[in-house]
Amino acid sequence: MQKDKGLDEIDRRILRVLRKQARLANNELAEKVGLSPSPCWTRVRRLEDAGYIDSYVAVLNQAQLGLGDTVIIEVTLDRHDEDQIQKFGQALAELPEVLEAYLTTGEYDYFIKVAVDGTAGYERFLRERLYKVPGIRHSRSSFALKCLKRELSPVP
C-alpha cells in the first residue's frame, strides 16, 4: 500500500494508542485522542479499510511460555537461485520458534529471530529443526541479553 499523505495528527494519535492498547473500548480511545466516540469509530474503520491497521494481536510473554531467550541467527545459503530462496523461506515459515525472518543484503542472506528455552533449547532447535532445512552453508548466532525496545510497527 502506498503511503497516504492524508493521515492527520488525530489519525496518528489513534494509531499510537492502538499500537500499545488495541483492546481499548472505543469510548476510552476517543477520550485519549480528543474525539467524541462516533467520529473516533469512523476514523478507526477508515484506518482499517485503508490498510493502516492489519490486525489486532495479543503480544505473548515468551518467558511465561517457557521460551524466555531470544536468539538472532544470521544464515548464508549455499545457493541463491529462486527455487532455493523460495524453499528456505517456506521452511522458516513452518518453524514455530521463528518469530521473524528476513531476506537481507550484506554478508548473510537471512536474519532470523527465534524464541527458545536457554542454550539447551537453542541446541535442540538447531539440530532438530533449522539444520534439517537443506541449503544452509553457514550460520552465526547471538543471544539477546536484554530487550531494550520492542515495537510492532512505527507510527510516522
What are these regions (language model features)?
Residues 1-156:
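A compositional/biophysical signature of low hydrophobicity enriched in polar/charged and small residues
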